[in-house]
């Protein structure tokens, strides 16, 4: 794969400084860039690295345009990181081999399934009765599409994705390998020392432009649907419980978990390994630090953390022991304050 700078500029815009005929064969970081690499600088504190890099071209903000031009070609744009993201999409699209349209002979597709224009169904995939696939949908090998599932146009499923009945995907979604959407939520009623299963009768609704990482699971609702808003980004190995609602353009890092019936607002982020307990509500613009456990609803936007800092084991044990005695220490402090007050 290679492209001249003028091709990048024509596709993505920005102000091009330097030789437009330079050939780019790689996108890479400043430190490992060579004379055929395009890189980017998103912050002025990396000015020194900009001067030292061997990159053929660097994407920079206007504040670094002069520095970049002194060392070689540059593309100047208000938001270099966003430009870099768009560049990776453009580059990947040129690298990607379009799958053949049509249904592979080894796939099993029910007679009443509706396939849009240009749909591709890979080997050993099963699509059950009543499913609807929009134009340009790509289903890779060994996927399972349950009865009545709806998949919006231009959505892509990697191998081994499972969509259970009652699942509706929006347009332009990307589901990575091993994703399971619409399995039963965890619902059981205790009765005389045993557990009685509560059948999960809802579905899962996923909005447009959602990306779901490998081996992430989203459970179907108990009665109402589980809802994933448009533009949501979910990393690998995330568990979303039944009846959860995640607002548009929120993002969650790997190994996070959201228990049943929790509601997460728009534009929220949840760090890796963080847990949101069931039936809680996070307002729009709430950001949860990695490994935190959210045990109460959060009504105001902002950054929230609930992580016990790491330490050597001996110190940690002492601090943990102190924490267990906080209520006693509080009572002793109150007693001392009363004695010392006039």
Curated annotation (Swiss-Prot):
GO terms for biological process: lipid A biosynthetic process. One of its GO terms (cellular component) is membrane. One of its GO terms (molecular function) is N-acyltransferase activity. Its EC number is 2.3.1.191. Keywords: Acyltransferase, Lipid A biosynthesis, Lipid biosynthesis, Lipid metabolism, Repeat, Transferase. Pfam families: Hexapep (PF00132), LpxD (PF04613). It catalyses: a UDP-3-O-[(3R)-3-hydroxyacyl]-alpha-D-glucosamine + a (3R)-hydroxyacyl-[ACP] = a UDP-2-N,3-O-bis[(3R)-3-hydroxyacyl]-alpha-D-glucosamine + holo-[ACP] + H(+). The active site is at 242 (proton acceptor). The keyword Repeat applies. Pathway: Bacterial outer membrane biogenesis; LPS lipid A biosynthesis. It comes from the Bacteria. Catalyzes the N-acylation of UDP-3-O-acylglucosamine using 3-hydroxyacyl-ACP as the acyl donor. Is involved in the biosynthesis of lipid A, a phosphorylated glycolipid that anchors the lipopolysaccharide to the outer membrane of the cell. Belongs to the transferase hexapeptide repeat family. LpxD subfamily. NCBIfam families: lipid_A_lpxD (TIGR01853), PRK00892.1 (NF002060). Homotrimer. This is UDP-3-O-acylglucosamine N-acyltransferase.
């Amino acid at each position: 794969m290679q492209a001249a700078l003028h091709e990048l500029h024509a596709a993505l815009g920005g102000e091009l400084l330097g030789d437009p005929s330079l050939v780019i064969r790689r996108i890479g970081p400043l430190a490992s860039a060579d004379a055929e690499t395009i890189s980017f600088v998103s912050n002025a504190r990396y000015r020194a690295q900009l001067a030292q890099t061997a990159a053929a071209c660097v994407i920079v903000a206007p504040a670094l345009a002069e520095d970049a031009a002194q060392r070689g070609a540059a593309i100047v744009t208000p938001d270099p990181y966003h430009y870099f993201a768009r560049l990776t999409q453009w580059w990947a699209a040129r690298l990607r081999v379009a799958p053949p349209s049509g249904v592979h002979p080894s796939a099993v597709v029910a007679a009443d399934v509706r396939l849009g224009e240009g749909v591709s169904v890979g080997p050993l995939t099963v699509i059950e009765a009543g499913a609807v696939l929009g134009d340009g949908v790509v289903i890779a090998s060994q996927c399972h599409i349950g009865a009545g599932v709806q998949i919006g146009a231009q959505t892509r499923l990697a191998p081994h994705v499972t969509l259970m009945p009652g699942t509706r995907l929006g347009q332009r979604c990307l589901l990575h390998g091993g994703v399971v959407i619409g399995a039963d939520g965890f619902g059981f009623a205790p009765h005389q020392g045993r557990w009685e299963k509560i059948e999960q009768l809802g579905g899962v609704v996923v909005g447009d432009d959602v990306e779901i990482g490998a081996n992430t699971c989203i459970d179907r609702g108990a009665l109402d649907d589980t809802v994933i808003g448009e533009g949501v980004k979910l990393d690998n190995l995330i568990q979303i419980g039944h009846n959860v609602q995640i607002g548009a353009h929120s993002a969650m890092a790997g190994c996070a978990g959201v228990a049943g019936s929790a509601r997460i607002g728009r534009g929220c982020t949840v760090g890796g390994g963080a847990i949101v307990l069931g039936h809680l509500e996070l307002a729009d613009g709430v950001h949860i630090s990695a490994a935190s456990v959210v045990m109460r609803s959060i009504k105001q936007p902002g950054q929230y953390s609930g992580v016990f800092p790491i330490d050597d084991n001996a110190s940690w044990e002492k601090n943990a022991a102190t924490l267990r005695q906080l209520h006693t220490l509080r009572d002793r402090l109150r007693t001392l304050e009363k004695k010392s007050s006039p």
